[in-house]
Amino acid sequence: MPSEIILIAAVTLDGFIARHSSEITKWTKDLPLFKEQTMGHPVIMGSNTFDTLSNELVGREVVIVHRNDDPREILQKVKSQKCFIAGGGKIYSRFYPFLTHLYITPHPYVFGKGVKLFSDIVNEAEVVFENLIQVNENKGIYQYQYKVKQK
């Protein structure tokens, strides 16, 4: 199992990752950073997310998670010491107990409804700030990196 299991997500200010599950996410401004950070590492995602991002994933091992797949079994098959969990909300929730880091990039949008970062209830966890990366200075967009301390 990887020593670093990183949730990576662009979110709106009200905590949504998309307006609906099949949205082609054109509103995010962090795609170049996503590509840089995930290059050479396995990226785990659900099939809807894969459908919306497939053109952006060249050069990466992509693991598509299906409804009945066991997150622990998937992670045990990963040979790399680092992998990224790239959505959607159901996948983030299912892999939540295994996360070691959160890379969250808030964007200046409010959707009001849509796909939440975690579609299911997750347990409380303490997160510790580790790093801040500038994504788009003109729009005030930064990626916040946290270490997760599961309770």
Q: Model features per residue range: what roles?
A:
Residues M1-K151:
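Enzymes that bind and transform nitrogen-containing heteroaromatic metabolites
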